[in-house]
Amino acid sequence: MSQLTHITERGEAHMVDASAKADTVREARASAYVTMARATLAMILDGQHHKGDVFATARIAGIQAAKRTWELIPLCHPLMLSKVEVQLTAETEQHWVRIDAVCRLTGKTGVEMEALTAASVAALTIYDMCKAVQKDMFIGPVRLLAKSGGKSGDFTGDEV
């Protein structure tokens, strides 16, 4: 079984020293869902929200969050991301919005936390923009779908 990399032998939290790692292309893909009432989703899709374009705002928030993950999550490295993509898809049958985030770089550490943060903050932004019309929206699941590159190898999770 793998060991926790952010904990020393004495049980102290520390930032991993990545200086000896090789630069490789690393990519991660994460998703999040926001389930809401059909009327709330229709309002978003019809462009009738008084705060403006919900999807555009959530996309920008997700991109910005990925770039600032190191400021939000202790022990994350600041990264020079080469790509952050946030896609929002309304699935009217399930009355949810699916958020897919992809982060990529060439570097020494992975971008899983950046992809997860992008998807999460995009979901939170949708909630924030729509809470005036519906407070019981549901966020989740939020999960890592895939990662590639790096010493630990590739990972692909099952689709929800």
From Swiss-Prot:
Record keywords, A-Z? Lyase, Molybdenum cofactor biosynthesis
Instruction: Tell me which SUPFAM superfamilies the record gives.
Output: Molybdenum cofactor biosynthesis protein C, MoaC
Q: Where are the transmembrane segments?
A: none
Catalytic EC class: lyase
State the Pfam families in the record. Answer: MoaC
Keyword hit for Transmembrane: no
Q: Where does substrate bind?
A: 75-77, 113-114
Q: Does the keyword Lyase apply?
A: yes
Q: Name one GO molecular function term.
A: cyclic pyranopterin monophosphate synthase activity
Q: Which family does it belong to?
A: Belongs to the MoaC family.
Q: How does it assemble?
A: Homohexamer; trimer of dimers.
List the protein's name: Cyclic pyranopterin monophosphate synthase
What is the organism of origin for this protein?
Answer: Sodalis glossinidius (strain morsitans)
Q: What gene is behind this protein? A: moaC
